[in-house]
Amino acid sequence: RGLGDVYKRQEYLFENEKTGEYVLSICADEVKTTCRLLVQERPETLAAKRCAFIVDHQQYHGKIKELQGAYLPYDNEEKILVCTPENDFNAGRERTGMGVLIARALQQNLLKDREKAEQSLREYHAFYLRELVNAATGLVCNCSGKDNSYFRLYNYPWAVTFFLECWKLWGEKENLKTAVRITEKFYEQDGFRFYPIEMPIVMLCQELKKAGEQEDLKTVRDLFLSLIHISEPTRHS
């Protein structure tokens, strides 16, 4: 007998408008088990709330000029911003993701106070250009103050994505050009032999094509394809 004759699939649809954890007790064929379900709000609602929290609580407006406009880690227990030279607590690196999220949320019209969020993003964009990136060369630094004492290629995909999202939001060509220069710098620094997480080559090529930037499109495509050629194993006859 096949498994289909022994086990009959049963489906149960669980719906609840209230968020939170729910525990279901399941009994089938005298077998008992427990299932825990976490009901969350819709992704767009969560994204909007996250963006509002970033704008209201995670942007620096204090006395330190170097950090003006930065999105920083936030201590929910102490209710304070946190910034230290340590990699996971500085003003660079994965904090870029907060800027990416707000730019995408603005593109999708998810935010109630659009004007406030866009002003916040403008301030973060200015911080990014001033403290983390050399827009002329494409260099991406690990920490504010153009501090690149800790070299990290993983910062480049984040930066390319951020400037691409700003380009898509505002249509300002310099953001697209900056994304190209960062990509070129990534490969210049041995990015050919480095496997990055989420290097947005396809999105960059699509946006360059839309913008009619054929020369930059060819440059980016050639750089990416050269990575494939380098990665090919050597064949012996």
Predicted segments — roles?
Residues 2-7, 229-234:
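Short, small-residue-biased leader/transition segments that mark boundaries at the very start
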Residues 8-46:
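Extended acidic/polar, glycine-enriched regions
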Residues 11-26, 96-147, 153:
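Structured core of small recognition/catalytic domains
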Residues 22-24, 162, 182, 223:
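A general structural detector for well-ordered alpha-helical segments in enzyme core domains, enriched
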Residues 31-126:
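An acidic-aromatic substrate-binding cleft motif
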Residues 77-95, 141-156, 183-198, 231, ...:
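Solvent-exposed loop and edge beta-strand segments that line ligand/cofactor-binding
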Residues 95-114, 158-172, 188-189, 198-217:
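Well-ordered alpha-helical scaffold segments within catalytic/enzyme domains
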Residues 112-131, 170-189, 212-231:
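Extended, well-ordered alpha-helical scaffold segments
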